[in-house]
Amino acid sequence: MKILVIQGPNLNMLGHRDPRLYGMVTLDQIHEIMQTFVKQSNLDVELEFFQTNFEGEIIDKIQESVGSDYEGIIINPGAFSHTSIAIADAIMLAGKPVIEVHLTNIQAREEFRKNSYTGAACGGVIMGFGPLGYNMALMAMVNILAEMKAFQEAQQNNPNNSINNINN
């Protein structure tokens, strides 16, 4: 299973950016932690990482995932969470599970950070757990995709389901 991890603006500055809020872990270290989790858990998962500070590039990357072999997306849109209806629209058209991650609890921050347009478009939001939130999102995504696959297989193998009856 292939999962796309999209990182938004200023996340490339983790380790330098306000350590009391974001800690000292860098973005590369977060990605290494995720890869280690995949290996230690013996998951059949391939992760692709993408970081940009540009809204349009996030939208392009989500759109490129449509019809691709990416089965799910984990996204931290950073501050675009609070401003980008365009990214929210792209998430809604992705046609696959999307989970939003935030290192901090955006509900405990400034008032303008409490609304997440992009989070409302996602299947779920994980926030406030620091770098661990990415592995939490990864665990959730693997489970969601496994459930979807099992459901699809059950539908295909059940001769009494309505789709098979329509085709007969």
From Swiss-Prot:
Molecular-function GO terms, alphabetical: 3-dehydroquinate dehydratase activity
Pathway assigned to this chain's UniProt record: Metabolic intermediate biosynthesis; chorismate biosynthesis; chorismate from D-erythrose 4-phosphate and phosphoenolpyruvate: step 3/7
Record field: catalytic activity: 3-dehydroquinate = 3-dehydroshikimate + H2O
InterPro entries noted in UniProt: DHquinase_II, DHquinase_II_CS, DHquinase_II_sf
Keyword entries, A-Z: Amino-acid biosynthesis, Aromatic amino acid biosynthesis, Lyase
Annotated Pfam families: DHquinase_II
Active site: 22 (proton acceptor), 102 (proton donor)
Root EC class: lyase
Swiss-Prot/TrEMBL site (Transition state stabilizer) positions: 17
Assembly notes: Homododecamer.
Family: Belongs to the type-II 3-dehydroquinase family.
Protein name (database record): 3-dehydroquinate dehydratase
Organism lineage string: Bacteria, Pseudomonadati, Campylobacterota, Epsilonproteobacteria, Campylobacterales
